[in-house]
Amino acid sequence: MNRLEKRMSACRKAGRKALIPYITAGDPGPEHTVPLMHALVGAGADVLELGVPFSDPMADGPVIQAACERALAHGTTLRDVFDMVRRFREQDGETPVVLMGYLNPVEYLGPAVFAEEAAAAGVDGVLTVDLPPEEAAPFTQAFAANDLCPIFLVAPTTAGERLEAVCQAARGFVYYVAIKGVTGVAELDVDDIARRVSAVRARTDLPVGVGFGIRDAESAARVGAVADAVIVGSALVNRIAGLTEQPERVPAVLAEALGEMRRALDGLAEEVAS
């Protein structure tokens, strides 16, 4: 097992809901990403999801699209993201890091080179939003050769052979998209999420993480009650957008928001234990 698999397994054994915050690398500026990563770990993150900025992030709503634009305006590249992970690893060799991005930058380097450089930097998993599992073999083979976990999205409409393909190809965890549409919009239907998560669990022993639509501690707790991991992105990135003129405040503000979610999730574990 690699670092991500070990962490997810440890959380499950401890009855701890894994908390996975997302930030876009290079936002609000490249110099702020590594300190922000450490701040999120200090606030209770179990895994970090680091977005690779891309010019056409089709699965993302306006909040993360704007974050990508800010990062790209600073000239943030894929290899800059690798360097950020490398610098994070100088102080933290334990917290798993998952890269989330789109296929074009990966194809530009080629699956083998991408996987080698990602692993060398200290990356543990890769979620390529627009990579269908049926076409993923060259990528998953390169990832396997470098002990990287391929992570795939399961949408509310995913069923049958597609769901089976995702569960067969994934490592680390399966990422269930809680809402139809892009990130940061719509309301959560926790009863429906519970049914969909059960359908995924019927096909795999992997933990199921749920993301898209989690806005605060209350919604994190509601989702955490039915999932193994809670993934939060737009709610954090939106706070960054409000602090672009005061970027030095970003780590503390995001740590406070994430800490509230951590406490809400830990409250679930205490309820189960009692």
Curated annotation (Swiss-Prot):
GO cellular component terms, semicolon-separated: cytosol
Which reactions appear under catalytic activity for this entry? (1S,2R)-1-C-(indol-3-yl)glycerol 3-phosphate + L-serine = D-glyceraldehyde 3-phosphate + L-tryptophan + H2O
| Span of the signal peptide | none
Q: Does the keyword Zinc-finger apply?
A: no
Q: Which Gene3D superfamilies match?
A: Aldolase class I
Q: Name one Pfam family in it.
A: Trp_syntA
Which residues constitute the catalytic centre? Answer: 49, 60
Entry's EC annotation: 4.2.1.20
Q: Kindly give the SUPFAM superfamilies that the UniProt entry links to this protein.
A: Ribulose-phoshate binding barrel
Citing just one GO molecular function, the answer is:
tryptophan synthase activity
Which pathway does it serve?
Amino-acid biosynthesis; L-tryptophan biosynthesis; L-tryptophan from chorismate: step 5/5
Q: Which UniProt keywords apply?
A: Amino-acid biosynthesis, Aromatic amino acid biosynthesis, Lyase, Tryptophan biosynthesis
Q: Which PANTHER family match?
A: TRYPTOPHAN SYNTHASE ALPHA CHAIN, CHLOROPLASTIC, TRYPTOPHAN SYNTHASE, ALPHA CHAIN
What is the role of the protein in this entry? The alpha subunit is responsible for the aldol cleavage of indoleglycerol phosphate to indole and glyceraldehyde 3-phosphate.
The subunit field of the Swiss-Prot or TrEMBL record says:
Tetramer of two alpha and two beta chains.
State the similarity comment. Answer: Belongs to the TrpA family.
What's the name of the protein?
Tryptophan synthase alpha chain
Give the originating organism: Alkalilimnicola ehrlichii (strain ATCC BAA-1101 / DSM 17681 / MLHE-1)
